[in-house]
């Protein structure tokens, strides 16, 4: 008689992109597979993904070259070097090699499930460092998760939602199952030949963010804003550590700038993310706003400011420009390049009325309404306008094309903050996605994939290779599952 309430060949903890990819691969090989999903629905952070990175894919080969004519489709070797060099070689070279070797297959698998790719491009137009790896699917991440869910069900994967895994079960140093809690609160013991942790990292656990991250270490967690409603609270990390796992680059986060209290698709958030005039609570500029070209770098920059707060300053001319001419930079599919922000004035008016944004007929009045020192703010704006008139920024060397004066009243201030999307470092793994201890010895039966695993990043998410997190989710899940298959068949 079994000592477990249920038994499977493979237990997958988490039903996002990495978990579904692992489960589908294993089930199609004949293994009995279960997904334990904490939330009431599957998808995780992958629902919010836009593009998927891939190297030497069938889509790239069919197109020949990017349609904008500015770059080329990179080789696997170029991708490998960008991962390792961007991270200053903090990336795990085995994991980076796994990524570039397996992402092209993701595109073919998803195409076989009905996904159509509308473009292979970059994330931020006019960003000269980005590689053309961003495979944009019709319907984006939400559509991809729908087809993967259907494929998993058709392959016979059991999926238990509202069922968080709480503890790994081990025997003689080998992981052999999990304890989970079902939707009624009952504890379930589930035995398995292997466990894959695909639970998304710890980015929504603000206590762990404060403890581990270098960007937000010891921050006031009341100032943190969660703009993506996921529950990636470090469950997999905790269970892995209890089982003897090591960590790597644990403190890296993917942070994006967003208007406080708003979504990434709001036009007020889109305007606030543009490379206009930014000041912090000292009423001074704190960076060259061209950093907006990379949302990851923007997130790092804002995270360092007092109270994780920045103010984006607009005048009526810039509001009119964004509404009629469109954005200067894009934020992927949340705010597209040159997208007309037609709702901006209405959103500003509403937020001013609600006390979430501020308006002034003079710079001094705006400063008073925001709570900034008026004399300092007036000096900052005057110096910035002089730089715009000259086409040269003597303070931070901001490119002339982004120098947009703030002269025509009324004036507005949008409060921007950094929102944690996901953690980018975590459980140490090898190239097979096996979880290892501090001596790099694999813990038998235990794997970590997607943003639960470390390996691709240093201290910052690598936007030079757009779509990396999503590409890693699918590739790592598949590679881990194949190692499980090979191990169980020995």
Segments the model singles out, each with a brief description of its role:
Residues 5-8, 184-194, 442:
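Core beta-strand elements of the Rossmann-like FAD/NAD(P) dinucleotide-binding domain
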Residues 10-35, 485:
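N-terminal Rossmann-like FAD-binding beta1-loop-alpha1 element of flavoenzymes
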Residues 237-239, 243-369:
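An anion/pyrophosphate-binding glycine-rich loop and adjacent beta-alpha core
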Residues 161-174:
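A conserved short coil-to-beta-strand element within the FAD-binding core of flavoproteins
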Residues 167-169, 362-365, 376-460:
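A glycine-rich dinucleotide-binding beta-alpha-beta segment and adjacent secondary-structure elements
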Residues 186, 190-259, 464, 470-479, ...:
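Glycine-rich loop(s) and the adjacent beta-strand/alpha-helix scaffold that form part
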Residues 1-10, 28, 489:
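Extreme N-terminal leader/targeting segments of oxidoreductases
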């Amino acid at each position: 008689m079994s000592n477990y309430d249920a038994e499977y060949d493979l237990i997958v903890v988490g039903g996002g992109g990495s978990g579904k990819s692992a489960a589908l691969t294993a089930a199609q090989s004949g293994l009995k597979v279960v997904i334990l999903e904490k939330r009431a629905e599957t998808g995780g952070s992958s629902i919010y993904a836009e593009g998927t990175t891939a190297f030497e894919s069938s889509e790239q080969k069919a197109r020949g070259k990017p349609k904008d004519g500015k770059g080329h489709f990179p080789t696997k070797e170029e991708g490998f070097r960008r991962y390792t060099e961007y991270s200053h070689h903090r990336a795990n070279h085995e994991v980076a090699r796994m990524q570039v070797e397996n992402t092209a297959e993701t595109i073919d698998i998803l195409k076989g499930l009905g996904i159509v790719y509308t473009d292979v491009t970059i994330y931020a137009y006019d960003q000269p460092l980005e590689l053309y790896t961003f495979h944009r699917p019709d319907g984006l991440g939400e559509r991809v998760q729908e087809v993967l869910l259907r494929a998993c069900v058709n392959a016979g994967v059991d999926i238990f939602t509202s069922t968080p895994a709480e503890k790994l079960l081990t025997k003689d140093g080998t992981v052999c199952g999990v304890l989970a809690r079902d939707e009624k609160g009952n504890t379930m013991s589930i035995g398995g030949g292997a466990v894959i942790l695909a639970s998304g990292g710890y980015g929504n656990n603000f206590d762990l963010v404060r403890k581990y991250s270098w960007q937000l270490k010891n921050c006031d967690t009341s100032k943190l804003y969660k703009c993506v409603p996921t529950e990636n609270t470090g469950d997999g990390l905790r269970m892995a550590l209890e089982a003897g796992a090591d960590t790597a680059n644990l403190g890296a986060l993917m942070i994006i700038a967003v208007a406080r209290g708003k979504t990434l698709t709001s036009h007020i958030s889109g305007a606030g993310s543009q490379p206009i005039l930014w000041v912090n609570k000292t009423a001074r500029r704190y960076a060259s706003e061209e950093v907006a070209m990379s949302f990851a770098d923007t997130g790092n920059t804002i995270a360092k400011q007092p109270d994780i707060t920045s103010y984006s300053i607009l005048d009526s001319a810039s509001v009119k420009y964004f509404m009629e001419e469109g954005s200067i930079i894009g934020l992927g599919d949340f705010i597209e390049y040159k997208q007309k922000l037609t709702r901006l004035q209405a959103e500003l008016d509403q937020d001013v009325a609600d006390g979430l944004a501020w308006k002034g007929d003079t710079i001094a009045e705006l400063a008073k309404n925001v709570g900034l020192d008026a004399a300092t703010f007036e000096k900052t704006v005057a110096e910035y306008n002089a730089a715009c008139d000259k086409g040269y920024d003597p303070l931070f060397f901001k490119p002339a094309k982004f120098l947009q004066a703030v002269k025509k009243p009324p004036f507005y201030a949008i409060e921007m903050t950094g929102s944690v999307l996901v953690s980018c470092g975590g459980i140490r793994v090898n190239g097979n996605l096996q979880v290892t201890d501090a001596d790099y010895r694999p813990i038998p039966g235990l794997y970590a994939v997607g943003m639960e695993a470390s390996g691709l990043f240093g201290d910052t998410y690598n936007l030079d290779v757009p779509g990396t997190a999503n590409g890693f989710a699918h590739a790592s899940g598949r590679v881990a599952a194949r190692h499980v298959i090979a191990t169980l068949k020995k």
